[in-house]
Amino acid sequence: LGAVHSMSHALGANQELRLHHGTLNGVILPTILRFNRDHVGDKYAKILRAMRKDISADLADEIEQLNKEIGLPNGLAAMGVTEEMIPDLVAHSMTDPSNATTPRLPSQEEWEKLFLEAM
């Protein structure tokens, strides 16, 4: 689950936006794939192989392309998320139980950057 779900849970808690959890996961996934890239061993190569992609491809780029093909929003901003929301989102994400399964636990500053990158 990891950081993708931590961010999705934080965003899903916003009752004004009423965002779909699965869509959030898809939109956020490329950002977290990049963040974790150097901490996952050969797992990305295995996923790329299962996707029938060259293992030297960038998995985050491949997921972004897939997201585009299936019509997902191109970022959190397209879903109504604003930069003003980030401090609350970070606070929620930092304490989410899904962090127990992340290969790389972000610091507060890294959480902020991750939300900005996912915008």
Task: Briefly describe each language-model feature range.
Residues 1-62:
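Active-site segments that bind and position negatively charged phosphate/pyrophosphate groups
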Residues 44, 50-119:
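C-terminal charged capping/lid subdomain of soluble metabolic enzymes
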